[in-house]
Amino acid sequence: MAESRLPLQGIRVVEFVHVIMGPSCGLVLADLGAEVIKVEPLDGDHTRKLTASGAGFFPTFNRNKKSIAVDLKSKEGQEIVLKLIKSADVLTENFRPGAMDKLGFGYDALSKLQPELIYCSLKGFLAGPYENRAGLDETAQMMGGLAYMTGPVGRPLRAGASVNDVMGGMFAAIAILAAYVERTATGRGQYVKSALFENCAFLMGQHMTEGLMTGKPVVPMPDRIRAWAVYDTFRTSDGDLVFVGVVTDTQWKIFCDAFGLADLLADPALKTNPQRVEARPRVIPIVTALFAKMTKSELLAKCEKLGLPFAPITRPEDLYEDPHLKATGGLVDIRLPDGERAGETAQTTLFPITLGGERLGVRLNPPTLGEHTRELLAELGYASEQVDALLADSAVA
């Protein structure tokens, strides 16, 4: 779909963002067709330099964007950025509270100059007692209930991906699109905000309500009583783990018939799902012993044939060879912009939607630092000699 007209084509977004939350918002808008311009300091978004578990941040969340490097503290740099903002429909930022105001690019100042601007802040917290605290995905998970629900009792555990950061970026994109639709009716922009803590609390809503409904403390996932009798990971004869779920009465009959468990199917004490959940201490050892005699491939094939919920336990690197992702075009090549492998090609996952039956593609590789500085300055009316002078004075890079 990269060559077709995209839904947000013609919308310009200027982003002052780093790490994951802010860039993921821009990624959503960029993949949907918006022109997203990443404003970076002269030495680049520090996310470019991250290693270890942060090495994938920049190339993953910055495709389909343009990069301009500017000294935001210089007079020339501020003039450039102000012109860039005046050309934009949307501004996004995820710096510490107050940082944009100190630079002269806060909402109050810009909304007076450009009432139609949609200004989106992505922060740790919405307005309230916590709003000036530094916020991270990790802190939101810890104080928002997710770490408690993920680890066993007494051992809170961070989820295995930056779920709050990415979700916060998506919620911000939703808010921006809502504000854009409203602007078509009113002609005015507005200030919108997304926050890590609140989106984690939103995730916890189902468990908060669970506690109200049951009148009991909510138990973390590893230690809780499952909602269904068979809803676990099981080890196969070749040492692998496979998840299998049996979540309806119909599936229970199919499961028992196919796996030779006629005694369990006929047992009146296991007729309903609540009865089977109560009998898990009896049911699970039987199922565990049964699956331990099967290989992983045998169990997966049988569950797929029966239409039962199942899943192999997959590592991130295994996804590159996933037959479904490969067959549906879910993986795409990008050029790595930084680090020891700069210039090499790597695969990344696409935005997980289709429009008109087609995936959203990559129009621009993750940019090198200042890759589009000259192009954007020319669009803003700077002559080639002026750009040369700005580069020589280190106002831009």
Question: What are these regions, as identified by a protein language model?
Answer:
Residues 1-175, 179-185, 368, 374-397:
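N-terminal helix-loop segment corresponding to the beta1-alpha1 unit
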Residues 36, 304-318, 383-388:
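Short, well-structured beta-strand/strand-turn elements
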Residues 1-12, 235-237, 318-397:
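Terminal low-complexity tails and localization/encapsulation signals of metabolic enzymes
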